[in-house]
Amino acid sequence: MAREYKIEDYRNFGIMAHIDAGKTTTTERILYYTGKSHKIGEVHDGAATMDWMEQEQERGITITSAATTTFWKGRDGKTRRFNIIDTPGHVDFTIEVERSLRVLDGAIALLDANAGVEPQTETVWRQAEKYHVPRMIFCNKMDKTGADFYRSVEMIKMRLGATAVVMQLPIGAESDFKGVIDLIEMNALVWRDESLGAQWDVVEIPADMKEKAEEYREKLIETVVEIDEAAMEAYLEGTYPDNDKIRELVRRGTIDVKFHPMFCGTAFKNKGVQPLLDAVVDYLPSPIDIPAIKGIDVKTEGEITRKADDNEPLSMLAFKIMNDPFVGSLTFARIYSGKLEKGTSVMNTVKEKRERVGRMLQMHSNSREDIEEAFAGDIVALAGLKETTTGDTLCDPLKPVILERMEFPEPVIQIAIEPKTKGDQEKMGLALNRLAAEDPSFRVKTDEESGQTIIAGMGELHLDIIVDRMRREFKVEASVGAPQVAYRETITRKHEEDYTHKKQSGGTGQFARVKIVFEPNPEGEDFAFESKIVGGAVPKEYIPGVQKGIESVLSSGPLAGFPMLGVKATLIDGAFHDVDSSVLAFEIASRACFREAAKKAGAQLLEPIMKVEVVTPEDYVGDVIGDLNSRRGQIQGQEARGVAVVINAHVPLANMFKYVDNLRSMSQGRAQYTMLFDHYAPVPSNVAQEIQAKYSGQK
């Protein structure tokens, strides 16, 4: 089977946004106009095509990024193939966003025209910057009360530090929003309400907007000619680029992430979606427009690149695992190079295991079609893989490569969970392991002392949904304890410890002496180890034992048994015995050495501090600030946003549980908040004593 669409006609993109910016609705409209959805699914009635998990339909928020393939005929009449990845906008699911950005070539950042740039917009924007993803901006909900396109443009500059190139101006706003002005063609598009947005009329720019349109077209040209010397010189001499040249420059600047073309409309009222789809074709990259993916050659350990080409060796990245009620476990993978046939054996280079591809599926939200072959640039769902988890590389066994791994954040909240009946015990273990394979930001462990099962995640909602999925998908009923904060421990001063481990009981004994300097490690690094041994006081082959010994006790600090952060250990001296010394003896010595030293090096308890943003009507500002202060919060500042006030604060996670209920009652349900993990900070001594007493009693 030959490739049906050329790789340059592919667009792999996602839609990223703050919760409630209308992401699912926009995706729905895209699927509707590209002919895949016959009835528009509304999030309001819980029937959106992309939101296919039950909890998503109930809660009206997108949790799992579903991949969808659809097709669109561009302005030139040529059909392009779109692979769209739906990403969640709720902060507890940033891992899903990070994961999908990793495999996208471009993205549409959605803004709510009323709220502009919101906290989660900043988060996903930063993640997209990290992966250098070209982005367009769609200012959605132009029909909403308080919609302000021009303020949104300003906020992009102020809050994201990004350059938005305005491509369209809105005609009217709020309930008077009728259509848009196209600043390249210099005409107006006005949608016909009766046609469900399928038809529009191209008319002249309204007289009262001509001047504004001229001004913004000038700004558009000024920005885009900067990336091309010849165009810049011609422009300075008074020669303007023609429309095709402008589009070419916008495309180049977008792909190089120099600026971001900005459009507007209202997906819910079906206005502005088709020009956005044309813009995806015109401005977002195909797989061959972006740099070839880099990886590590397993044989030589050198860096290699894999071009987006069917004739290159196969390489693909598994970016999502999902349980499907009909097919079982599905692995979503992006093929970067080569081609894949059903039934082929591939190598998982991270796990060093071979896997056989059983079925290969092309996904449309929650319907699917079997395919025999897939090519570079495709996003496919694979059935039958046993060992593969998120972030693994699958490739040609004869040309092994490891593509860069994704980084996953450490969980900040944990709860104890118990099955309600004996019969649920085994099923619960199975369910939790399945869910952990799907979601790397969710962890499961057993508390050694109490034997309880502990689950950890990115926030209360994240864990609620895990427990909920366990009940629905695996039919396991469980009771959950109160949420626990993921505290950490560190040391605050330098300390040198000399420790000798001796054991003599007939036969070969054990002997190892180590002298280690422990000191705080600069922020950002969990643990660093260095050996300054000269003259063989500790033989080279024993030094890994010293490092391993220290690392083995970092998981349980001296104060309350929490994992330790920010420790640097330098081995400066030691002694060994020709017969009695071994790697194990040095491991035992360094372990005991660190335990002794940790108490004397000013051990300190750390807690996760969250960045909290509250958006509240002015009447409740005093109450909100007072309440945040009572939670040990530090107010970072406040600003007006329309008629609301935005309060920024840093608050310990320990004091934020059930905050949503308090905020609702305090503001009669009118205030909202978002919360992101920001950093770890020392716990005040009075609070630290309570925590130590509580946890030491449990340990």
From Swiss-Prot:
<comment type="function">
    <text>Catalyzes the GTP-dependent ribosomal translocation step during translation elongation. During this step, the ribosome changes from the pre-translocational (PRE) to the post-translocational (POST) state as the newly formed A-site-bound peptidyl-tRNA and P-site-bound deacylated tRNA move to the P and E sites, respectively. Catalyzes the coordinated movement of the two tRNA molecules, the mRNA and conformational changes in the ribosome.</text>
</comment>
<keyword id="KW-0963">Cytoplasm</keyword>
<protein>
    <recommendedName>
        <fullName>Elongation factor G</fullName>
    </recommendedName>
</protein>
<dbReference type="Pfam" id="PF00009">
    <property type="entry name" value="GTP_EFTU"/>
</dbReference>
<dbReference type="InterPro" id="IPR000795">
    <property type="entry name" value="T_Tr_GTP-bd_dom"/>
</dbReference>
<feature type="binding site">
    <location>
        <begin position="86"/>
        <end position="90"/>
    </location>
    <ligand>
        <name>GTP</name>
    </ligand>
</feature>
<dbReference type="InterPro" id="IPR005225">
    <property type="entry name" value="Small_GTP-bd"/>
</dbReference>
<keyword id="KW-0547">Nucleotide-binding</keyword>
<dbReference type="InterPro" id="IPR000640">
    <property type="entry name" value="EFG_V-like"/>
</dbReference>
<feature type="binding site">
    <location>
        <begin position="17"/>
        <end position="24"/>
    </location>
    <ligand>
        <name>GTP</name>
    </ligand>
</feature>
<dbReference type="InterPro" id="IPR004540">
    <property type="entry name" value="Transl_elong_EFG/EF2"/>
</dbReference>
<dbReference type="Pfam" id="PF00679">
    <property type="entry name" value="EFG_C"/>
</dbReference>
<dbReference type="GO" id="GO:0005737">
    <property type="term" value="C:cytoplasm"/>
</dbReference>
<keyword id="KW-0648">Protein biosynthesis</keyword>
<comment type="similarity">
    <text>Belongs to the TRAFAC class translation factor GTPase superfamily. Classic translation factor GTPase family. EF-G/EF-2 subfamily.</text>
</comment>
<feature type="binding site">
    <location>
        <begin position="140"/>
        <end position="143"/>
    </location>
    <ligand>
        <name>GTP</name>
    </ligand>
</feature>
<feature type="domain" description="tr-type G">
    <location>
        <begin position="8"/>
        <end position="288"/>
    </location>
</feature>
<dbReference type="InterPro" id="IPR009000">
    <property type="entry name" value="Transl_B-barrel_sf"/>
</dbReference>
<dbReference type="InterPro" id="IPR035647">
    <property type="entry name" value="EFG_III/V"/>
</dbReference>
<dbReference type="InterPro" id="IPR009022">
    <property type="entry name" value="EFG_III"/>
</dbReference>
<dbReference type="GO" id="GO:0003746">
    <property type="term" value="F:translation elongation factor activity"/>
</dbReference>
<dbReference type="InterPro" id="IPR053905">
    <property type="entry name" value="EF-G-like_DII"/>
</dbReference>
<dbReference type="InterPro" id="IPR020568">
    <property type="entry name" value="Ribosomal_Su5_D2-typ_SF"/>
</dbReference>
<dbReference type="InterPro" id="IPR031157">
    <property type="entry name" value="G_TR_CS"/>
</dbReference>
<dbReference type="Pfam" id="PF14492">
    <property type="entry name" value="EFG_III"/>
</dbReference>
<dbReference type="GO" id="GO:0005525">
    <property type="term" value="F:GTP binding"/>
</dbReference>
<dbReference type="InterPro" id="IPR035649">
    <property type="entry name" value="EFG_V"/>
</dbReference>
<dbReference type="GO" id="GO:0003924">
    <property type="term" value="F:GTPase activity"/>
</dbReference>
<dbReference type="InterPro" id="IPR041095">
    <property type="entry name" value="EFG_II"/>
</dbReference>
<keyword id="KW-0251">Elongation factor</keyword>
<dbReference type="InterPro" id="IPR014721">
    <property type="entry name" value="Ribsml_uS5_D2-typ_fold_subgr"/>
</dbReference>
<dbReference type="Pfam" id="PF22042">
    <property type="entry name" value="EF-G_D2"/>
</dbReference>
<dbReference type="Pfam" id="PF03764">
    <property type="entry name" value="EFG_IV"/>
</dbReference>
<dbReference type="InterPro" id="IPR005517">
    <property type="entry name" value="Transl_elong_EFG/EF2_IV"/>
</dbReference>
<dbReference type="InterPro" id="IPR027417">
    <property type="entry name" value="P-loop_NTPase"/>
</dbReference>
<dbReference type="InterPro" id="IPR047872">
    <property type="entry name" value="EFG_IV"/>
</dbReference>
<dbReference type="GO" id="GO:0032790">
    <property type="term" value="P:ribosome disassembly"/>
</dbReference>
<keyword id="KW-0342">GTP-binding</keyword>
